[in-house]
Amino acid sequence: ECFRPGMTDLEFQYEIEKRMRKNGSIGLFRAFGANMDIYMGSILAGENAETPSPFDFALGGGGIDASCPLGANGTLLKEGTAIMVDMAGNYTAYMTDMTRVFSVGRLTEEAYRAHQVALTIQQEVENATRPGTACSDLYNIAANIAKKEGLSANFMGTEQQAKFVGHGIGIQINELPVLTPRSKEELLPNMVFALEPKFVIPGVGAVGIENSFLV
């Protein structure tokens, strides 16, 4: 319903945002940390996914202005382009966070394989998620699978790789726990976190998945 041939990533995002608001999202993006106030998420199309960002998010994107270098930048959604939709909505005052990937036509086999690896990471991390599990262990599960599949250089970015694969979510989009290799925190009952294993394929775009889990 949102996509039309010839549109840009910005036009695609406007259509998604409109539907989010019409379905109850209040349009608030609340983040913890200085200079983390952005809009309702990001659309990363094609090579724009390779652009690093100063924000502490999984991936970057050039954005429409240097004052907010993140997300959609006017890229034309053409044949062979991967489109990562990472939009944050609300249920009452609580944040939601989900990522899905679409494509215009066929992508490269490497992109499809990397996306499947992201799904495998999600399943293996979910299997290991229980109270008492160390956040660093969950990150290492993800990183080791990426390494085994020869995709370490693409994992969580290329030019600038994020050093986490998941984060807590609640009133703010980025709460504890954070799934990083150096975290000493353990999961507690009823924690909620978003898991987002992603890969950037140069010349194609970003692939991967993001879903939220209750411990």
Indicate where each model-derived feature is located:
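Active-site neighborhoods and metal-handling regions in enzymes and metal-associated proteins
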Residues: 1-215
